[in-house]
């Protein structure tokens, strides 16, 4: 029961905090209408939620040798954060523990295969981010 509760806690952090902060960056993708202040504020919000995630990770009882349902959203969200860093100049502070978590879940074939299939659509979407 405790592991399910912890998995729900991770999932809720993603679904109610981190992912909405990342989603708020989509209106800033188009180069012609980008608001640099919104990008700066978005980076600060995302960084805050990544710091919260690092705190959860530091005390997590979830077995790191298994891929949990709550991990799946983070994999794609991390990919979008990195894409927005490159395309929008999004300033993000990545905690060391979160980068280690990203690498760990990216090591699962289910995640790496999905990201490989998904990335071309991301790249296509981001073409409007450049002049």
Which residue stretches match the model-derived regions?
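GST superfamily/GST-like fold recognition
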Residues: 22, 62-87, 91, 97-99, ...
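Alpha-helical structural motif
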Residues: 3-6, 18, 49, 77, ...
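Acidic/histidine-enriched, glycine/proline-rich intrinsically disordered or flexible terminal extensions
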Residues: 118-131
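Conserved C-terminal alpha-helical bundle
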Residues: 2-60, 81-87
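A short beta-turn/loop motif at secondary-structure boundaries
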Residues: 1-2, 66
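Residue-level signal for nonpolar/aromatic packing positions in well-ordered secondary structure
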Residues: 7, 53, 71, 105-108
């Amino acid at each position: 029961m405790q592991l399910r509760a912890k998995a729900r806690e991770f999932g809720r952090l993603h679904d109610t905090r981190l992912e909405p902060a990342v989603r708020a960056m989509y209106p800033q993708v188009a180069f012609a209408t980008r608001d640099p202040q919104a990008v700066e504020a978005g980076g600060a919000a995302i960084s805050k939620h990544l710091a919260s995630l690092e705190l959860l990770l530091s005390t997590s009882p979830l077995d790191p040798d298994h891929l949990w349902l709550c991990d799946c959203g983070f994999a794609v969200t991390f990919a979008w954060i990195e894409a927005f860093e490159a395309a929008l100049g999004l300033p993000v502070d990545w905690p060391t523990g979160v980068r280690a978590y990203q690498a760990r879940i990216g090591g699962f074939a289910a995640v790496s295969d999905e990201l490989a299939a998904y990335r071309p659509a991301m790249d296509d979407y981001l073409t409007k981010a450049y002049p």
